[in-house]
Amino acid sequence: MGKYFSDIHASCESQFRGLPHGLADTPEIAACRAEPENYEALLSLADALCWQLRFREAIDALTRAIALAPERIEAYRKRGPKYLDTLQFGAALDDYTRCERADGVSVESRYRIGMAHYMLREYDAAAAAFSDSLALVSRDDDMCVADIYWLVLSLLRAEKNADAHAVLRQHYAPDMYVGHHTAYEKAMRVAAGFAELDEMLSELEAEPEDLQYTMAAYGLMVLLESRGKQARTEALREKILRRDGFWYCFSYLAAYTDAAQAEPD
């Protein structure tokens, strides 16, 4: 996966549960550690650690940077997403909120805050944030379909199915611009009634990329859940969790969190 992260990288369990990852420092990480500790050096160290998906160590580096210059916002911008990637959703929301106060409301700030609320299972708050983001985004921006996807899923989870379908009628079109978010569009195509769920699931079975599979399949999983198909929901979630090649994508994090919530005490 060298396009996005190192081929040698930390596992999801090491980052979700704080287990040893067994990785040696890369030359880039070692070089960053050798630098005198200052704000910029710690941000560079965090970036180098993230290339190996060593997000918990990156959080530590960014927290040390914040201690050196708590008034600066750059480390908070980097730390919030890493908290989300390690299932520390409340901490992610705190950092996202701080950044929005500093930087102003934007498509990205509302989207990130919505994502934190969704992971916390605060679906009404998530829907409000995604709705805000959707109101700001341009129709020719690929974030539009991402907002639609997560807004619809938030509303379905909040048991507001009529509102979810109203969003689809107002904002979704099969020929809308989606950029690289083709997997989100596939799930929304089914939700909007332009494709059959079982046909899309069959198509996904041939998808070679875990990222694309997970993004589309998670949306279909929530759709199945909203239709009362619990056994099929759980079976699809199991398939998603086995496709962990891009484990820090939002849809995988959501599926993993759903599974953890479903486990008996």
Residue ranges and their predicted role:
Residues 31, 64-65, 98-99, 133, ...:
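Canonical positions in the second alpha-helix
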Residues 34, 68, 102, 136-140, ...:
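Structural marker of alpha-solenoid helical repeat scaffolds
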